[in-house]
Amino acid sequence: MAIANKNIIFVAGLGGIGFDTSREIVKSGPKNLVILDRIENPAAIAELKALNPKVTVTFYPYDVTVSVAETTKLLKTIFDKLKTVDLLINGAGILDDYQIERTIAVNFTGTVNTTTAIMSFWDKRKGGPGGVIANICSVTGFNAIYQVPVYSASKAAALSFTNSLARLAPITGVTAYSINPGITKTTLVHKFNSWLDVEPRVAELLLEHPTQTTLQCAQNFVKAIEANQNGAIWKLDLGTLEAIEWTKHWDSHI
């Protein structure tokens, strides 16, 4: 899918990987980039607007843990304004296994609920035009970082959900693929808590291994968007982009 002149909604488009991806998307010239995030960042929005003045960048506050009804209400505001939306990126995520319920709510349930809400506008069974969903999951959905089992399980669930969405495309008209970053130097990785403190040094241990920058990840993310392959399981690791078969695995080596 060419990004040029498209209308894109990006949930959590101001985070580490998210913000660099927003930059790369804006460079590609969409008509509209609508960013939904929990915390407003006027400086970041201003930077995106200055990067390509031809692109309309809009921000709405959004917490993915709200109800489907609340999300649907927000999306109606956006659809009423834009008329059409081509791509939804679900990017919200936290890495803190102290917060069990919130981890599941943000990383999995939030993705499911946001997707469920947009189906009201896209589902071809309701007369909708269809659409494309890119869900940011994780390589931990392939093989867990076992010291953060809650995070890993939430990402595995999001990946499974995305794979199902892709299989449902002939019914709904909505295609989907997953974006699965490897270890990336973001604030998410620099400091986080393992489950029950089973490994206090887990973040430090991970960063002892080769990583990638958020820019490398973002550039490959845009390539995946352009490829627009329904059902693709994209691995974005060590600055590379690979469409993997489910029989392949990834290991944290710690």
UniProtKB/Swiss-Prot annotation:
It catalyses: a primary alcohol + NAD(+) = an aldehyde + NADH + H(+); a secondary alcohol + NAD(+) = a ketone + NADH + H(+). Keywords: NAD, Oxidoreductase. GO terms for molecular function: alcohol dehydrogenase (NAD+) activity. Its EC number is 1.1.1.1. One of its GO terms (cellular component) is cytoplasm. It comes from the Eukaryota. PROSITE patterns: ADH_SHORT. NAD(+) binds at residues 10-33. It holds the Pfam family adh_short. Homodimer. Belongs to the short-chain dehydrogenases/reductases (SDR) family. This is Alcohol dehydrogenase 2. It comes from Drosophila arizonae (Fruit fly). The gene is Adh2.
